[in-house]
Amino acid sequence: MRKTKIVCTIGPASESVEKLTQLMEAGMNVARLNFSHGDFEEHGARIKNIREAAGKLGKDIGILLDTKGPEIRTHTMENGSIELAAGSQLIVSMDEVIGTPDKISVTYDGLIHDVSVGSTILLDDGLVGLEVTDINKDKREIVTKVMNSGTLKNKKGVNVPGVSVNLPGITEKDANDIVFGIEQGVDFIAASFVRRPSDVLEIRELLEEHNAADIQIIPKIENQEGVDNIDAILEVSDGLMVARGDLGVEIPAEEVPLVQKELIKKCNALGKPVITATQMLDSMQRNPRPTRAEASDVANAIFDGTDAIMLSGETAAGNYPVEAVQTMHNIASRSEEALNHKKILSARSKQVSMSITDAIGQSVAHTAINLDVNAIVTPTESGHTARMISKYRPQAPIVAVTVNDAVSRKLSLVFGVFATSGQNHSSTDEMLEKAVQKSLDTGIVRHGDLIVITAGAVGEAGTTNLMKVYVVGDVVAKGQGIGRKSAFGEVVIAQNAQEAAKKMKDGAVLVTKSTDRDMMASLEKAAALITEEGGLTSHAAVVGLSLGIPVIVGMENATSILKEGEDITVDSARGAVYKGRASVL
């Protein structure tokens, strides 16, 4: 079962209900809408189709709105493009002009105040590099030297590595797009070109003004300034996207893998989801199979600790959108098999100060690994407990049961968490019982599984204070257990020693009213013993202890409740009998 989440960008190649359904079946968890392209009508139609496809499949698919952000671009060029020659002089004007080989202009007129002589300006994702040689503030012009030849087309991106650019946190377009997203009920805002915490707070203020504070903000780190301010940015954010495209232009390419590892590590420490994005399976826009380097890139992001991996052009405009998702699913699933969960847990358990929820999350992860449980089940109001458990990367899947569909969708970015909708409860016992039932409904948990349940006060977020180890089973009957062992076997019912001698076989569970010394030969074959007669000093109790087999005494009507030949699990520690095979301690 894949735990890494997959984010898919939706575009012309994937916007139909039919194609979206195929993407979801292939493994898409979150749909990304890139607001650098398209209008409200297009994106509104895509959101409608996403919800229709998700509804058909009964899936909770998160929707992520990716803002265009406060970027810098060139204006238009003469005849659509110009040729720039290495060594030539190029003036960058703050006033809009038609671009020529001698002079171009940019959309941000404050650039002249941010750069200095010696600064580097990169055009079109670094295709052409410029070095600032002079600044003429009277003419509002930056004089540069072209570092390498290249063709420059209309409205290309401008990057200024190593320079703190005083662009606004969000533009007017971004604000309008976010308000549209609020009206459409999106789950995440991916904020482009975040440089400082105030950029995130501007968006949070806008969300609060529109009563949408529950929408999560995922800053995209795309420049050196964002990397430098990462700790402060994470304090006010709900997660992070490592946007390696622009980041690789702003900082040297050889630094990108190291920055990726560091950003992921910081998110892991805080229990905040992190998305690794850009060019993960880029060649699959054109080819049905990825390059070996791309497969390694996806795997290494998972080894680094990413919660989610993202597809951009591969699903938005590529020729093989469904195949790209399936490929990413296959690589992620195989890579997860190589994760050393004990090592990860040990490394992340060295945190000194923590909240009660964090402490419970760590304890749950330790218990899950030590007992090799089948699943972790957590009823949750806000999703916080599930995130805190995921932080420690337990091997067992985390089933988060929530009454809030929006919380369920927000957990679609969190590693190892499988959210399902529950219902309101009046007591903790009822909440736990219903959570176990919902986990059974998902198919992740089955009867006989050993699970860990963690929860808090009913209806209150942030109160997690309970952990329970539980066997999910059909409890057939109960009595008084002797010892702490368990056994699985076929039921043999005997009313007396003669019947027992005739029917008993090695490894069976002997069920009888009472035992005596005439039954010793049969008892020596038994995997477990159940009697209707009670008492810690009864013959059955004493003999069972001496033979070292699990015994349950005082089980009323055991010879009529249990059926000849049925398979059961005897748990003497709890004095319980489960139908079929159950995982008990």
Curated annotation (Swiss-Prot):
Record bears the keyword Nucleotide-binding: yes
Annotated TM spans: none
Keywords: ATP-binding, Glycolysis, Kinase, Magnesium, Metal-binding, Nucleotide-binding, Potassium, Pyruvate, Transferase
Site residues, Transition state stabilizer: K220
Binding residues annotated for substrate, in chain numbering: R32, G245, D246, T278
Pathway membership, UniProt: Carbohydrate degradation; glycolysis; pyruvate from D-glyceraldehyde 3-phosphate: step 5/5
Annotated catalysed reactions: pyruvate + ATP = phosphoenolpyruvate + ADP + H(+)
EC number annotated for this UniProt entry: 2.7.1.40
An annotated Gene Ontology molecular function: magnesium ion binding
Binding of K(+), residues: N34, S36, D66, T67
InterPro entries reported for this sequence: PEP-util_enz_mobile_dom, Phosphohistidine_dom_sf, Pyr_Knase, Pyrv/PenolPyrv_kinase-like_dom, Pyrv_kinase-like_dom_sf, Pyrv_Knase-like_insert_dom_sf, Pyrv_Knase_AS, Pyrv_Knase_brl
Binding site for ATP: N34, F35, S36, H37, R73, K156
Record-listed Mg(2+) binding positions: E222, D246
Pfam families, alphabetized: PEP-utilizers (PF00391), PK (PF00224), PK_C (PF02887)
Cofactor: Mg(2+); K(+)
Subunit structure, as described in the record: Homotetramer.
Membership in a protein family: Belongs to the pyruvate kinase family.
Protein name: Pyruvate kinase
